Amino acid sequence: MPINKSEKPESCDNVKVVVRCRPLNEREKSMCYKQAVSVDEMRGTITVHKTDSSNEPPKTFTFDTVFGPESKQLDVYNLTARPIIDSVLEGYNGTIFAYGQTGTGKTFTMEGVRAIPELRGIIPNSFAHIFGHIAKAEGDTRFLVRVSYLEIYNEEVRDLLGKDQTQRLEVKERPDVGVYIKDLSAYVVNNADDMDRIMTLGHKNRSVGATNMNEHSSRSHAIFTITIECSEKGIDGNMHVRMGKLHLVDLAGSERQAKTGATGQRLKEATKINLSLSTLGNVISALVDGKSTHVPYRNSKLTRLLQDSLGGNSKTMMCANIGPADYNYDETISTLRYANRAKNIKNKARINEDPKDALLRQFQKEIEELKKKLEEGEEISGSDISGSEEDDDEEGEIGEDGEKRKKRRDQAGKKKVSPDKMIEMQAKIDEERKALETKLDMEEEERNKARAELEKREKDLLKAQQEHQSLLEKLSALEKKVIVGGVDLLAKAEEQEKLLEESNMELEERRKRAEQLRRELEEKEQERLDIEEKYTSLQEEAQGKTKKLKKVWTMLMAAKSEMADLQQEHQGEIEGLLENIRQLSRELRLQMLIIDNFIPRDYQEMIENYVHWNEDIGEWQLKCVAYTGNNMRKQTPVPDKKEKDPFEVDLSHVYLAYTEESLRQSLMKLERPRTSKGKARPKTGRRKRSAKPETVIDSLLQ
């Protein structure tokens, strides 16, 4: 039962963080790499130790839930994803995303092997869970489920379900809706099989590639969004709509070029992937740091889309995937540190009741209107159906209340026709046509007139039938989109839902048993400590103190090692930021050099006054650019070539092209200047030419 609008609870929860460690793969076994990760599922700890000869103590991290190499897909789903999806079905926003180094099993955790029920990942299992909940809902509850699928490839948002996957989409933001993707396609689904087909279609369009660390490496971040709208009657007697959004995110893995061997396009992709993941880490750090006043959500498309999921209106679960090999020791430690930091992010989730962008209420309204039209029947004028001439006599009536009389006449001339009535009218038309053919005493003109009248009535009847059928089809299509609670929609997903339920019950029993064992273990440890405190001699006391001292010394060395690693990591981040600043400074100086040498200062100031930064597309834009340059030149009238410009200068003798023919013509046309009286100069002033102009030109050209 939904709550009143005035009572919207706000759930303040931390981001749930779980860690999953995959087993050693065949390549790592063939290279004889050792296992450096130990998983204690009962205590929820991950211990990483160096396998070389160094005396560095192992590092231990504690999380909400941890999964070892032998963990099952169903267990991962029931312990981590099920609570999030239950919250989404109640109207909250939810986000589940996998984070970690490339090749650690993020895509397997999120998608799995869909052909095998036991190996399906979080996304396919959520399909059966959602429609299983709808099938168990009350009969007066209405649901609308729609999905969308996008990827972020090289910092470009692409629609994996659209016709053109290379088209770049824009990220927009509205106060009432929040961050959204403009022109992103969404499809209404009726069962889990529809969802699975759409996901398969989008997965085929996703960018993948091979590297040295992963044969099927994801080269983009993918976000599969499920929007669930639910309409039911509230305590005030009115229908309320709740809308929950579930974002299922499969992130591309962070890479080191030396290990992946990425070159060319793969290297460019890796650079963009690392940049967005670095921004994600900066966002996590800023949210955890209480002194930070700015969270850099806008520095990356990924963090912009996950803005609500990290520190906003969402219940979020982060699954950090790690590899067990000592070869990936540094990457494993980095992933665990980020995950450990993300535990402290606080989200404020609330139920989305009666949102403005809900489609369920709009569909229900259209269905009611269509049902009303079908019950009342199509309105066809009386003259079109009966062919009576009463309306013809009334058409000439004009009075002071002519408009009202016309309206009454129109209402009286309209009839409501049901499907049964249409059948009767069709039969009547057929009878009249037969009777018309049997009457031989009618004149040809009357016969043609009667036949035309019958054809007109038949056309009107056919049109009414087509409109009725169109309304039925439209109503059927809308009713298919709106799912009624309590209807069995599982179909093939019924087996998967059964597996999930059995696994959930088994997990409950195991959880109770683990809790009991944990309490017993704590009691045993407390008893051991009490026994150790009771010394019978000074020698035993010295041994006990020495053991405690060694334990404290180990903890001290671990803390120092952790501090040294953090300082080294911090120094690396500072050096990376400084290198970015130096690169940006070089690019800025180059741009300023070009601008100062090619654009006058006055025009620079004019451009600066009319330029603004577009946050949505990440580019500078000029105001009123539609009224400048080529856009205005297209509208400039072309002058008439016949009218000669009085100020036009004759440039016919100028050498526009230095060819032999043009040079010869220019010299032949050139005339000697005349005196002021208009008389030619005396012949004595001329010199005798030794050669013809053609020969001079030829010699010059040679």
Swiss-Prot record:
Residues 355-593 form a coiled coil. Residues 376-400 have a biased composition (Acidic residues). InterPro entries: Kinesin-like_fam, Kinesin_motor_CS, Kinesin_motor_dom, Kinesin_motor_dom_sf, P-loop_NTPase. ATP binds at residues 100-107. Residues 600-702 are annotated as: Globular. GO terms for molecular function: ATP binding; microtubule binding; microtubule motor activity. Keywords: ATP-binding, Cell projection, Cilium, Cilium biogenesis/degradation, Coiled coil, Cytoplasm, Cytoskeleton, Microtubule, Motor protein, Nucleotide-binding, Phosphoprotein. Residues 410-424 have a biased composition (Basic and acidic residues). PROSITE patterns: KINESIN_MOTOR_1 (PS00411), KINESIN_MOTOR_2 (PS50067). Residues 675-690 have a biased composition (Basic residues). Heterodimer of KIF3A and KIF3B. Interacts with CIMAP3. Interacts with CLN3. Interacts with DCTN1. Interacts with FLCN. Interacts with AP3B1. Belongs to the TRAFAC class myosin-kinesin ATPase superfamily. Kinesin family. Kinesin II subfamily. Microtubule-based anterograde translocator for membranous organelles. Plus end-directed microtubule sliding activity in vitro. Plays a role in primary cilia formation. Plays a role in centriole cohesion and subdistal appendage organization and function. Regulates the formation of the subdistal appendage via recruitment of DCTN1 to the centriole. Also required for ciliary basal feet formation and microtubule anchoring to mother centriole. This is Kinesin-like protein KIF3A. The lineage of its organism: Eukaryota, Metazoa, Chordata, Craniata, Vertebrata. The gene is KIF3A.
